[in-house]
Structure formats: structure tokens, C-alpha cells
Amino acid sequence: PSFCPKPGDGTGLYEAMLEAKAQGKIRHIGITNHRLNVAMEALESGLYETLQFPFNYLATEKEHKLVEVCREKNIGFIAMKALSGGLITNSKVAYAYQAQYDNVLPIWGVQRETELDEFISYIDNPPVLDEEIKAVIENDKKELAGNFCRGCGYCMPTCPAHIEINNCARMSLLLRRS
């Protein structure tokens, strides 16, 4: 949501989560968001046990702060867009980067069986965040970091022509990476 659901805010969302937990339908209350300010508000509220937020090696310093706050507050961090919606094409590098955080669980967004096989192979033979991998990360940051479309789709409902704005905005980057 575009806000942080809280008890008594009039939406009933947080109360519904509490009810679902009391009924045993869920074990934890978490929040998923793409907005940094909403994510930080959720962490500071003390109401949530997990945060699901876009996080990969293209993340900004402010996004890294979310990981630190989650660690400090013992809140689970689920990293969505761990491959940045297809912009990050080297799974070995992405895996090594995410593995440095003991409190981050990435969602890889596997689309092909071969990709799944790659990630499964890292369980027994995990890549290490060495100088070679760090160099790849730095190169990708120079090429890709900044104010690029992260593919969340929040802009889509606003287009009266129903243009897939997120895909159009990312096309030049995706073509360059292919």
C-alpha cells in the first residue's frame, strides 16, 4: 500500500492481520512495499515481523539502511527484485552479494529451469564475494544504478492508453544487457 497500515487507522487492514494471526491462518505479520518512507515507517512502528522490499546490489545507501534497521530490530528482510527485474544477469554475482547478509532472504524470480538449476548449484558450492565479483558489481553499478525504472508497475494504472510504462522505461537497459 501507499501507507503503513496501523491499528485504528480506519482501514481495518492491520486489524484483519491480527485476526488472521489469532485464527492461526498466518504466523507472522509482514509488509511488502516499494516506497522507502513507508518501509522505514513500518520498521519504526514495531508492528511488523517482516519487510519485503526491492533489494539487490544496485541498492542505494538508504535501501541498505533498511537491512541494518531490520537486523537491529530482529525483523525479517525479504529481498524482492534480487535480480532487479532482469537487469542483473549474472546469478553468481547476485547470489554472492545477497549471501553476505545473514538477515536477508532473496526472492530470485526464477523463470526458467536452467536458472533454477543455477541457484540450486549454489547451495553446495556458494560463490564468494571476492574481488572479481566486487568488480562486476562496481561495473554494473556504473552502468545501471541511479534513477532507473525498477519495474514495480505502480505507474501502470495511471496510463489511459494502458501502455506498459514499466517495460517501456526499462527497454533500453534490457536491450543493452541482452
Question: Which residues are covered by each model-predicted region?
Answer:
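Glycine/proline-rich, positively charged
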Residues: 1-78, 83-86
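Structured C-terminal cap/extension of enzyme domains
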Residues: 65-79, 83-178
